[in-house]
Curated annotation (Swiss-Prot):
It comes from Sus scrofa (Pig). The chain crosses the membrane at residues 70-94, 108-132, 144-166, 187-208, 232-256, 281-307, 316-339. The gene is OPRM1. This is Mu-type opioid receptor. Glycans are attached at N9, N12, N34, N41, N49. A motif (NPxxY) lies at residues 335-339.
Amino acid sequence: MDSSADPRNASNCTDPFSPSSMCSPVPSPSSWVNFSHLEGNLSDPCIRNRTELGGSDSLCPPTGSPSMVTAITIMALYSIVCVVGLFGNFLVMYVIVRYTKMKTATNIYIFNLALADALATSTLPFQSVNYLMGTWPFGTILCKIVISIDYYNMFTSIFTLCTMSVDRYIAVCHPVKALDFRTPRNAKIINVCNWILSSAIGLPVMFMATTKYRNGSIDCALTFSHPTWYWENLLKICVFIFAFIMPVLIITVCYGLMILRLKSVRMLSGSKEKDRNLRRITRMVLVVVAVFIVCWTPIHIYVIIKALITIPETTFQTVSWHFCIALGYTNSCLNPVLYAFLDENFKRCFREFCIPTSSTIEQQNSARIRQNTRDHPSTANTVDRTNHQLENLEAETAPLP
């Protein structure tokens, strides 16, 4: 068991977030989104005071060129994830809102997933600044917002993927019931319910998050009641169970039943075209779920291991910790790429947005003209009456033959 989790060491390690060499801290849940608590941070007194300690403190991660290489690599990766994630997810939401044909039940769930991913990637600039400066300069309010957004993203994403898996199961295994259940309206209601469920952890985390001035820098972290080691590890275990184990079990059962159904029945709907679309959408959702699990499994496993045992702090441990966190965020920018490659409708809409053809421009112009006509019917009628009056006047004033 971690020494910081032992109540006998409470006198020497009263704060699990403290990077002091007196204790070996378990990274807090907020450290999943906050670089100020990661091993090897620039604000760590182990690094700042290495000269004073004579470089002999074995609890401090080794410094040197690997730390600089790690910092540059992390900043480059997070910049790419932020740009691609924001642009890609906003493009997904725009396409679903813009095109009527995209307003299906599955795409409504995809909209919810894109919204959660966009919110998560929007916090990366704040965390990058925090990592470079070694302190949190944005105040308590933004600290609460950034940490709560991370938890909202984690839970809303996995709840939405569970919903999409159940939705696919109903569409494949119970096609008759799917006609009444799988509607855009029901999908929107379920999305709202997913956000409400996520608030069960998102709101408490928002109240628990605060800024602390310690060792010459400001930390953005979660505060726990005493004994802190108990509540901190309890939160980690709850997150591991409800945001990973249970959802993965639900998804596995749904897709296991779907695979058995698809193998046993050659024709699902009586139409080859409908069956092809059904299998294509099911394959896309399966890939999205699989990528999510691959990206989030390492950080969940890592946090649980750190909560249970003491891991020696080495360069490899520091790099692997950063890599696990970066992998979790990378998932937020991968989904739009997956849609572009796996779904023909998304691919076509993305292409029209990026490279509009002449026919697309004409359709947009004609739609705009029709909209203006509907918005201003009196103006159109006035113009028609004026033209008619001019024609009558010309006929009346024309010279007789």
